[in-house]
């Protein structure tokens, strides 16, 4: 299964934890980060296969900030943790930029919070930015914006953020690099009978028991959060691999189809998962009616919806809201995320994209709903 899941993945999110990035808190591990960046660059260029799109989610800002500030122990005050994050993020971003530049690869820093992905408009903006960076061949390096959040520092984790990013960009796979070789049936440090888990279904409830539960020593060490992250990633059709981050050429070997670490398989196909999410779980905020030609293009060709094909707009919605697309007879044929608010959409009906800047005062996306953010209902 690993051979097909990772070998065939074209968009991959890689998450690496702070213990690896900072060499157990001793400072940024320049050699390790350089190795991961070398592998990321090789994947983007298609070394040994097809080019991949890769996003790195990296912890380590707080740990690096503590080192730079001369703090030997993690402070308990939130504002001190936030200060450490602000100091450390400078070094973290600089290190990735330097190591990727050594590979002649562009990089971009993106700081996110859970709130950014909970708000539909900010979600859509973040998605558009990341997809543009990937299209440009740039490696986005994402971290949680610890300087402005509170609960995430106290209880959150970048395993969850990695899964949310996988959802956001519709990744094919999530790779979590950790200081453990993968998942065991019990804590191998305490139970000599513990068996290594090579593969399981991401939604298997028994996995959480294997990880020890949230209150166990292993759970506090992070394995439980990785199991939950894999379950979340599976919701959008992405399978997850948990592997030792210091395994030589771990990313390249996974991409070649080698069996390394634990594979947690998503039971839902990526497109099916997105359809279910779009159709069943998001509330409609309005609708647009299109002419017969636009309806045919959506139904038959899966094209994006352009405003020139719209004849009417109903409801009051904002950018990022879910809207229905109706044919001239009023039948709902698709739904998706709106690139324009309802007031703007009314101005754009029957207009070509060349007129958008004159009408709106700014130039934005040429589509009302991009095909990547749309589900054609007849194709369910």
From Swiss-Prot:
Its EC number is 2.7.2.11. ATP binds at residues 15, 178-179. GO terms for biological process: L-proline biosynthetic process. Pathway: Amino-acid biosynthesis; L-proline biosynthesis; L-glutamate 5-semialdehyde from L-glutamate: step 1/2. The keyword Metal-binding does not apply. Keywords: Amino-acid biosynthesis, ATP-binding, Cytoplasm, Kinase, Nucleotide-binding, Proline biosynthesis, Transferase. Pfam families: AA_kinase, PUA. InterPro entries: AceGlu_kinase-like_sf, Asp/Glu/Uridylate_kinase, G5K_ProB, Glu/AcGlu_kinase, Glu_5kinase, Glu_5kinase/COase_Synthase, Glutamate_5-kinase_CS, PUA. Gene3D superfamilies: Acetylglutamate kinase-like, PUA domain. Catalyzes the transfer of a phosphate group to glutamate to form L-glutamate 5-phosphate. This is Glutamate 5-kinase. It comes from Acidovorax sp. (strain JS42). The lineage of its organism: Bacteria, Pseudomonadati, Pseudomonadota, Betaproteobacteria, Burkholderiales. The gene is proB.
């Amino acid at each position: 299964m690993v051979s097909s899941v990772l070998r065939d993945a074209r968009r991959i999110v890689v998450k690496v934890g702070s213990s690896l990035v900072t060499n157990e808190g001793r400072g940024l591990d320049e050699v390790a980060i350089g190795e991961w960046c070398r592998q990321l660059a090789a994947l983007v260029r298609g070394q040994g296969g097809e080019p991949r799109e890769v996003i790195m989610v990296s912890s380590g800002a707080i740990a690096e900030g503590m080192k730079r500030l001369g703090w030997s122990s993690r402070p308990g005050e939130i504002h001190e943790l936030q200060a450490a994050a602000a100091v450390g993020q400078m070094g973290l971003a600089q290190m990735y930029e330097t190591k990727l530049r050594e590979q002649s690869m562009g990089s971009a820093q993106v700081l996110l919070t859970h709130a950014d992905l909970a708000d539909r408009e900010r979600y859509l903006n973040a998605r558009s930015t990341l997809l543009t960076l990937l299209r440009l061949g740039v490696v986005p390096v994402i971290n949680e914006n610890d300087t402005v959040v509170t609960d995430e520092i106290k209880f959150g984790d970048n395993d969850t953020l990695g899964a949310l990013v996988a959802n956001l960009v519709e990744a094919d796979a999530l790779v979590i690099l950790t200081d453990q070789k993968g998942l065991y049936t019990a804590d191998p440090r305490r139970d000599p009978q513990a068996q290594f888990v090579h593969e399981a279904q991401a939604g298997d409830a028994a996995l959480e028991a294997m990880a020890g539960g949230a209150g166990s020593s292993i759970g506090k060490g992070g394995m439980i959060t990785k199991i939950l992250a894999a379950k979340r990633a599976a919701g959008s059709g992405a399978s997850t691999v948990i592997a030792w981050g210091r395994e030589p050429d771990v990313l390249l070997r996974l991409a070649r189809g080698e069996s390394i670490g634990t594979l947690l398989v998503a039971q839902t196909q990526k497109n099916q998962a997105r359809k279910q999410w779009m159709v069943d779980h998001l509330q409609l905020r309005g609708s647009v009616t299109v002419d017969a030609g636009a309806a045919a293009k959506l139904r038959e060709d899966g094209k994006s919806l352009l405003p020139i094909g719209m004849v009417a707009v109903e409801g009051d919605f904002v950018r990022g809201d879910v809207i229905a697309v109706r044919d001239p007879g009023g039948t709902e044929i698709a739904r998706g995320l709106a690139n324009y608010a309802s007031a703007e959409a009314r101005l754009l009906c029957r207009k070509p994209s060349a007129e958008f800047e004159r009408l709106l005062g700014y130039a934005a996306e040429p589509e009302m709903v991009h095909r990547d953010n749309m589900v054609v209902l007849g194709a369910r």
